Amino acid sequence: MNSRFKSRLAAALVAVCCSIPFAHANDVTGAGASFVYPVMSKWSADYRGATGKQVNYQSIGSGGGIAQIKAATVDFGSSDAPLKPEELAKYGLAQFPSVIGGVVPIVNVAGVAPGALKLDGPTLAGIFLGRIARWNDPAIVTLNPGLALPDQKITVVHRSDGSGTTFNFVNYLSKVSPEWKAQVGEGTSVPWPAGIGGKGNEGVTAYVKQVKGGIGYVELSYALQNRLAHASLKNAAGRFVQPSEESFAAAAASADWARSRDFFLVMTNAPGEASWPITATNFILVHKQPKNVAGARNARDFFKWVYANGDAQARELDYVPLPDTLVKQIEAYWAQNLTF
């Protein structure tokens, strides 16, 4: 190695070593739900613009986010499947909501416009069980008398990874279909009786776009951004409703957060004539006594900024911001449970 190259290498190493602490001292690392990735990306970009601090969020699914925060390899985890208080206590974790959204069935059927297809819970369960296998099945046709449905195979697309989106979807199916509850049940991963798997909301969206006759389930933003047709669903009040910020907010209005322990609450199949039946909450997980105190504090500060400044970005992407009363409960929870 010649002396000139050695000098250049030494100078480069000095520059890198000196710059890294300053570039990353205020960074935040997070991982988890793809459900929240669209709004998390927007929040992160705006937060960097406002504060100069970087939030690095990996969209790896709720299961991955839970695993990473338990292992303390990130400053925060993100999951649409809340952890029970007993599990939080076991790993020394705190849990609080970030935003509310909705899971929607998406379809790739020629001639079916967004919102035109009507489905109820038992029929949706029958499709994902593989029992209803063609688009002109009488169960679907009966719900859609004015819609021309083809004699076409239904291809079910589900998640292949541990998923909070799946948790809320199958939790809903278990509530509305005894058949589903008995045969499949609920969880972040389930033994799917039919279909193909895609990783993340992104993977399910991509498969449904590619496969004619496909049906899957994703957070609403993925359907809208990819111009995929979504179905309307029959809710607990017996009304067909469209997924929207308004129908998600209607479902969220019934949530009694004050009585929940560690914010453990699932709001699928919520009451109310205007409620979307697969409304879901994204939850943030942090260590109560973190090894990386600075990173945990930076994560808390990021979400404090989100609650104060992130409502417009959430609404722009058809999520529902948390009400002020819930934000105050979260701040009180932080004061009681976080040591940093």
Task: Cite the ranges covered by each PLM segment.
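Residues that act as N-cap/strand-start positions at coil-to-secondary-structure junctions
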Residues: 1-3, 22, 90
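Bacterial N-terminal signal peptides that target proteins for export
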Residues: 2-11
